[in-house]
Amino acid sequence: MASAAKGKILAVIGDEDTVVGFLLGGVGELNKARKPNYLIVDKQTTVQEIEEAFNGFCARDDIAIILINQHIAEMIRYAVDNHTQSIPAVLEIPSKEAPYDPSKDSILNRARGLFNPEDFR
């Protein structure tokens, strides 16, 4: 029997409610270096900690998608905008306190720029 290739995982950066929801869904994992694939952001979390976690998740080869609350992505917008690799994909998601605003999603805006609206008529 052939062994299955190891799959890639999600990473989550968000408020406690968002991250706990995903952890309850089974996405929490520690890598070989005992580093988690999530960061809970609260009032005491610094922008530097958020940016380090984001860059760390981008550098990991076991992560395929990074989910980040949009209001937290705004705090490190320069880092999110500088990420141009397709993997890991970065998806901005709403939180309980901050609804999703498509106009602030730089990745969505970049994707819109790839297509001509006339192509969809």
Curated annotation (Swiss-Prot):
GO MF entry, a single one: proton-transporting ATPase activity, rotational mechanism
The keyword Ion transport appears for this protein: yes
Phenotype on disruption: RNAi-mediated knockdown results in increased protein aggregation in the oocytes of sperm-deficient young adult females which is not eliminated by mating.
Keyword hit for Metal-binding: no
Keywords assigned by UniProt, alphabetized: Hydrogen ion transport, Ion transport, Transport
Gene Ontology cellular-component terms listed: membrane; proton-transporting V-type ATPase, V1 domain
SUPFAM superfamilies from the UniProt entry: AtpF-like
Biological process per Gene Ontology, one example term: lysosomal lumen acidification
InterPro entries assigned: ATPase_V1-cplx_f_g_su, ATPase_V1-cplx_fsu_euk, ATPase_V1_fsu_sf
Disulfide bonding pattern of the chain: none
Family designation: Belongs to the V-ATPase F subunit family.
Self-association and partners: V-ATPase is a heteromultimeric enzyme made up of two complexes: the ATP-hydrolytic V1 complex and the proton translocation V0 complex. The V1 complex consists of three catalytic AB heterodimers that form a heterohexamer, three peripheral stalks each consisting of EG heterodimers, one central rotor including subunits D and F, and the regulatory subunits C and H. The proton translocation complex V0 consists of the proton transport subunit a, a ring of proteolipid subunits c9c'', rotary subunit d, subunits e and f, and the accessory subunits vah-19/Ac45 and vah-20/PRR.
General function of this protein: Subunit of the V1 complex of vacuolar(H+)-ATPase (V-ATPase), a multisubunit enzyme composed of a peripheral complex (V1) that hydrolyzes ATP and a membrane integral complex (V0) that translocates protons. V-ATPase is responsible for acidifying and maintaining the pH of intracellular compartments and in some cell types, is targeted to the plasma membrane, where it is responsible for acidifying the extracellular environment. Required along with other vacuolar ATPase components for the removal of protein aggregates which form in immature oocytes in the distal gonad.
Protein name: Probable V-type proton ATPase subunit F
Organism: Caenorhabditis elegans
Gene: vha-9
